[in-house]
């Protein structure tokens, strides 16, 4: 079996770069002391940043205990993320080529697709460990980096038009190991928690459980959304193991490749006057009748009259519905 922690492979994966724009965004958020959610989103936008943050957070004495980026961000000192981003290698997608481009961007895009679909699957399955699932999904293909570092022709040897399961079988035949197992070895070498390592290692097992099952479903959905073949029977089977019934799985498939949202005709007539729109904008800001009256130089009774007309014209019953309706139609 290949040793993913040996010389060439280990160092190459350790130096895997973040997209320049991802790195710049993290630095900007960290330097202005963004809140935890903003920092988590900035880190999770890139697998290289995710690896770097988790490795840093899982050093002694916390080794093996930090399961997610959110936990890591809460654990690390305020200036740590800025220092980490400054030290992280980057690549410019349109700039000079290095050994990872364009493979690095393909890896990042697939990782983020699986990450977001894993969060959606976790939500549908009613799971409460979404942060850990998102982290496992972001890192699920780490072993592919090790294989690509050791075997430059890796992508050409493994048929791109095969299903995920067929590609894993080819890896085992060509290299004696699959990328899931190699990824688990790498994750353990960085002192990541055992549950996270197992999810990375086992997402291509015949019968994955727990987080690995959620990642496996998300991985197949991401391949399907990208136009790659998958085994539908395998998707249904692993969906069951992830506690995702057929209706829930069908709903996610319906949303692919991206969640749908209503698009309103910009020419659709707004039934409100400009004064009434000013009032709705004030409602959106959380202002009450007296505040709106003072701001617009009107009496409170006039504001109440305007509100009655606004509700009637929009067909709503209260201020919250008025703000929602006007926002959805793009009138604000």
Please report, for each region that a protein language model flagged, where it lies by residue.
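Basic, Lys/Arg-enriched C-terminal extension of HTH/homeodomain DNA-binding domains
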Residues: 266-267, 312-332
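Conserved alpha-helical "signature site"
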Residues: 1-154, 167-229, 331
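Short, structured interface segments
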Residues: 244-263
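Hydrophobic residues on short alpha-helical segments
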Residues: 277-281, 311, 323
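Recognition helix of helix-turn-helix DNA-binding domains
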Residues: 286-321
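Alpha-helical residues within the helix-turn-helix
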Residues: 41, 135, 294, 312, ...
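Regulatory hinge/linker segments at domain boundaries
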Residues: 260-281
């Amino acid at each position: 079996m290949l040793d993913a922690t040996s010389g060439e492979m280990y160092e190459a994966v350790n130096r895997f770069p973040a997209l320049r724009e991802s790195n710049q965004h993290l630095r900007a958020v960290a330097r202005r002391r963004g809140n935890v959610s903003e920092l988590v989103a900035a880190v999770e936008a890139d697998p290289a940043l995710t690896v770097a943050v988790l490795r840093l957070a899982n050093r002694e004495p916390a080794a093996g205990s930090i399961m997610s980026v959110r936990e890591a961000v809460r654990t690390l000192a305020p200036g740590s993320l800025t220092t980490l981003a400054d030290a992280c290698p980057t690549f410019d997608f349109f700039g000079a080529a290095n050994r990872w481009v364009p493979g690095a961007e393909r890896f990042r895009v697939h990782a983020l697709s699986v990450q977001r679909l894993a969060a959606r699957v976790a939500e549908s399955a009613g799971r409460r460990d979404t942060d850990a699932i998102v982290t496992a999904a972001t890192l699920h293909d780490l072993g592919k980096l090790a294989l690509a570092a050791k075997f430059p022709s890796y992508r050409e040897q493994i048929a791109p038009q095969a299903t995920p399961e067929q590609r894993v079988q080819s890896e085992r035949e060509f290299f004696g190991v699959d990328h899931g197992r190699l990824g688990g070895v790498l994750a353990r070498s960085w002192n990541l928690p055992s549950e996270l390592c197992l999810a990375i290692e086992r997402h291509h097992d015949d019968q994955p459980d727990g987080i690995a099952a959620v990642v496996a479903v998300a991985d197949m959905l991401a391949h399907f959304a990208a136009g790659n073949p998958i085994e539908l029977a395998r998707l249904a089977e692993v969906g069951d193991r992830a506690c995702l019934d057929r209706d829930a799985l069908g709903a996610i498939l319906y949303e692919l490749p991206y969640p749908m949202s209503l698009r309103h005709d910009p020419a659709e007539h707004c039934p409100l006057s400009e004064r009434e729109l000013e009032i709705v904008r004030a409602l959106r800001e959380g202002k009450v009748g007296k505040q709106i009256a003072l701001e617009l130089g009107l009496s409170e009774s006039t504001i109440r009259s305007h509100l009655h007309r606004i509700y009637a014209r929009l067909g709503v019953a209260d201020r919250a519905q008025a703000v929602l309706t006007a926002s959805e139609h793009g009138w604000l």
